[in-house]
């Protein structure tokens, strides 16, 4: 991902304020509610029968935290996202058979959640930088599919 020095600063500064546990669970939960067909990858998570059930599900929250932990690793290696996400790309492609379009959806949901949490601090410039990052991460996760 090519980010200007200002964009890198904007991304890392905001990310330093992110509560990964809270934002991760909310982002994954919103993905499952807004795009219900994605729930098929999480059938082992128990009750996903309603938006409240999804958002309160401890397995959704725990996996969301794990997902955002991996995203944090990507932020530390913006110049090598494909390498950073190679194993996760392989896992999601070969073993889990996740449609790579879902990575884009999750990235966009994450941007919405960040905007919700940070309000005015999440300026258009910060959003533009994050859109680049989530697109780069989605591309890296889809790399094994090509």
Curated annotation (Swiss-Prot):
GO terms for biological process: hydrogen peroxide catabolic process. Heme b binds at residues 63, 92. Heterotetramer of two alpha chains and two beta chains. It comes from the Eukaryota. It comes from Chlorocebus aethiops. InterPro entries: Globin (IPR000971), Globin-like_sf (IPR009050), Globin/Proto (IPR012292), Hemoglobin_b (IPR002337), Hemoglobin_oxygen_transport (IPR050056). The modification N6-acetyllysine is found at residues 59, 82, 144. The modification S-nitrosocysteine is found at residue 93. GO terms for cellular component: blood microparticle; haptoglobin-hemoglobin complex; hemoglobin complex. One of its GO terms (molecular function) is oxygen binding. Keywords: Acetylation, Heme, Iron, Metal-binding, Oxygen transport, Phosphoprotein, S-nitrosylation, Transport. The modification Phosphoserine is found at residue 44. Residues 2-146 form the Globin domain. It holds the Pfam family Globin. Involved in oxygen transport from the lung to the various peripheral tissues. The modification Phosphothreonine is found at residue 12. The modification N-acetylvaline is found at residue 1. This is Hemoglobin subunit beta. Belongs to the globin family. Red blood cells.
């Amino acid at each position: 991902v090519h980010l200007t020095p200002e964009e890198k600063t904007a991304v890392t500064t905001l990310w330093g304020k992110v509560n990964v546990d809270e934002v991760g669970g909310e982002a994954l939960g919103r993905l499952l509610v807004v795009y219900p067909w994605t729930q098929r990858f999480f059938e082992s998570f128990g009750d996903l029968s309603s938006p409240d059930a999804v958002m309160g599900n401890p397995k959704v929250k725990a996996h969301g935290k794990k997902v955002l932990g991996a995203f944090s690793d990507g932020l530390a290696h913006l110049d090598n996202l494909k390498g950073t996400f190679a194993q996760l790309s392989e896992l999601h492609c070969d073993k889990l058979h996740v449609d790579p379009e879902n990575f884009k959806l999750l990235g966009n949901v994450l941007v919405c959640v960040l905007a919700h949490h940070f309000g005015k601090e999440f300026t258009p410039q910060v959003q533009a930088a994050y859109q680049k990052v989530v697109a780069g991460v989605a591309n890296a996760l889809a790399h094994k599919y090509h």
